[in-house]
Amino acid sequence: MVKQTISAFILEKMYRNRVIGGRHISLEDLRTGCPSHERGNIERTLKKLVKENLIVQHPTSYGMQYALNPQRIDEIMKILNIR
């Protein structure tokens, strides 16, 4: 996968599962469905998306969780070519 494809994979998976705002997903669950040789790139790309504020972090007692930023959902939909 190319970096852009990994970003699209993460955003699409989270959008498809409606992981927006208060609903969140762990890094381990995000990695499922991705080829094993690309799983290291998922974490690096996820950190990049957090810095771009497309994804927000939710610290929990059982680890860091991630969700799509509801304030930037229109931009995310443009990236995914939805609508």
Model region roles, listed by residue range:
Residues M1-I20, L80-R83:
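Short alpha-helical segments that sit at the start of domains
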Residues R16, I20, G33-S36, I55:
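General structural signal for alpha-helix termini and helix-helix connectors
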Residues L27-R39:
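Short helix-coil junctions and helix-kink-helix linkers
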Residues C34, L68-P70:
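Short beta-strand-to-loop capping motifs
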Residues E43-K47:
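Short, hydrophobic-biased segments on the C-terminal half of alpha helices
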Residues Y62-L68:
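Minor-groove-contacting beta-hairpin "wing" of winged helix-turn-helix DNA-binding domains
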